[in-house]
Each structure stands twice: as C-alpha cells, then as structure tokens.
C-alpha cells in the first residue's frame, strides 16, 4: 500500500483511501488531482480487491482518459483498466451491450462532424437548400440546440417512429429549420447512427424504461469517480445520479465553482 501512497500529501492520501460513500475534492489545476484519481483507482483494485470492470472513472477528454489508463496500467500491471472514459464513451459501452432495448443494432454508427456534414449535403440537395439558407456550422449548432433545449423528447421519434413515419415528417417540413432537423433525424434512423447528444439520452431512456438493464449497470459499477465535476451538464448529472444510486460510492473532483 505504501507504494501507492508514496509522494502524496495528506489531503491526497485521504482522497485515495476514503473509498466509501460520497467524497468531494476541491482541486484546481496543478494540485495533483490526476495523481489522486489514478492512485485511488489502483488502491481500489490492489488493496480492496475491486475488479477494474466494477469501477467507472469519467474524464472530459479522450486524451485525459488515455493518459489515466496508461498511469493505472503502470500502477497495477493490469491490462483491464475498467471504464475509464468520457461520459459519451461510457454510453457507447452501454449501448453496444444494450442497444437491443431500443431496437438498434450493437454496431451502430457514432457520428462525427464530417458524418453530420455528409448527411446535411444530402438534405440540402434533396430539398434545394443552399448555404445561404443556413451554413453547415449553423445547422449543426441548430440541431444541437433543438435536441438539448427546444425538442428534448426528439429521441422518441428516433426510437418509436418507423423510417417511413420519420420520412413523412421530413417531407411535410416547410421551413429550413424543420427540413434540416427532420431530414437529419431521418438520416440518423436510416443509418442506425447516433451523435454525441443521442448517446446520453438513449442511455438515460433505456435506464428509465428497463429496470433490469438499469440494475445491471448500477450493481456492476461499485465505485464511480468523476473529474472536472464543475463542467458536467444536466443530462450527464442525471446519468451520474442513476449510476450511483445502488452502491452510493461517488467520488467527484472539481474546482471551487461547484
């Protein structure tokens, strides 16, 4: 154990070894929070015998997640580093296992901006829109705002409507905004594709509608750690609350703002 605690100050040692219940650490840049997170993960595995696959550690960039995986591997020697990922990356793992609950295949497509632009090109060509009507950048922003704020139940169209029913909504749309939005949903459904916003709301929907799947993940994730807690948004906060509701072991790190 002393190897895992070597070089840590008193506050960091306390953060690493206080494993049960709700633990909040206020830490800014340069305070050694990444070291505390990685040592805490290694402590849970090496000293408490927790399987890496029963730990979720959320970071806010893929780069940070990769660096944390590397550090934990160096500490534990275990190639299994559990669920060390962004919220979106974790939701990909959930959906790859349980997308059948919303009648999506396990090999769904996760969209990036270039994929979205390719879909927009199809919509613009089909409906004679031009970039004067709305630029691709503005269209991407509009779609995100519609999904997050104006039409938060949009995902039900993707899940419950048939492809023909979505196409009918797209065909009936008569403003650039509605044409682009429903055309995009139709393209998503046609390709079994999900963007970053969809990943979280689909996961939340499955957890809300399917108690068996929700309990499976709640029981699996005995310990949850979240970095940069002050930056999480409302859907991410809801997801965190669902996941930690069973074991109630939550460790969060953030600056003094939260």
Regions found by a protein language model. Give the residues of each.
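Conserved adenine-nucleotide phosphate-binding loops and their immediately adjacent elements
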Residues: 1-4
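Conserved helicase NTPase motor core
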Residues: 7-17, 21-25, 36, 56, ...
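Residue-level signal for well-ordered alpha-helical positions
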Residues: 28, 40, 71, 75, ...
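ATP-binding Walker
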Residues: 31-32
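Walker A/P-loop NTP-binding motif
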Residues: 35-50, 67, 71, 241
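Conserved SF1/SF2 helicase motif Ia
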Residues: 44-60, 249
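Conserved P-loop NTPase-based nucleic-acid remodeling module centered on helicase motor cores
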Residues: 54-141
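Basic/charged alpha-beta structural segments of nucleotide/phosphate-handling enzymes
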Residues: 117, 121-193, 211
